[in-house]
Structures are given as C-alpha cells and as structure tokens.
Amino acid sequence: MAKAKDVRITISLECTGCSQGNKKYPGVFRYTTQKNRRNTPTRIELKKFCPYCYRRTICREIKK
C-alpha cells in the first residue's frame, strides 16, 4: 500500500548564473530531478553545467 504522503518529490533546480544576467543567450536554464524529503529536508544546491552560461554553475532548488 502507498503511504499518504510521498517521500520522494520532484523539484526544479535553477541556474544562479542565468538569473543574475551574466550570460550569452537569453533565458534561465532549469534542471528537473527528485529528492527524498526525509534525507534532505533543506533546499538543495548542486554544481551543474549550464548550456546558456557555458560553464558549471551553482543550481538552487526553487519553489513550484
């Protein structure tokens, strides 16, 4: 049986370099992934590659 509240949720990670405006192309790049609420209750910050900025930047979890 499934539990009432799912442990894994889908989150979006947004590039911080794109949101500050120092990039070559217009737009903001976002990754979609899942996280476990019990293991990581706080917001996630990962270093991922951004094709708009052409480098690895910090991507932060955003609200949906």
UniProtKB/Swiss-Prot annotation:
The record ties this protein, via InterPro entries, to: Ribosomal_bL33, Ribosomal_bL33_CS, Ribosomal_bL33_sf, Ribosomal_zn-bd
Q: Which cysteines are joined by disulfide bonds?
A: none
**Pfam families from the UniProt entry:** Ribosomal_L33 (PF00471)
Identify the GO cellular component terms for this protein: chloroplast; ribonucleoprotein complex; ribosome
Q: Which UniProt keywords apply?
A: Chloroplast, Plastid, Ribonucleoprotein, Ribosomal protein
User: From the UniProt record, which GO molecular function terms apply?
Assistant: structural constituent of ribosome
N-terminal signal peptide: none
Q: Which GO terms describe its biological process?
A: translation
Q: Where in the cell is it found?
A: Plastid, Chloroplast
- Per the record, the domain of life is Eukaryota
Keyword Plastid applies: yes
Family from the record? Belongs to the bacterial ribosomal protein bL33 family.
Q: What is this protein called?
A: Large ribosomal subunit protein bL33c
What is this organism's lineage?
Eukaryota, Viridiplantae, Streptophyta, Embryophyta, Tracheophyta
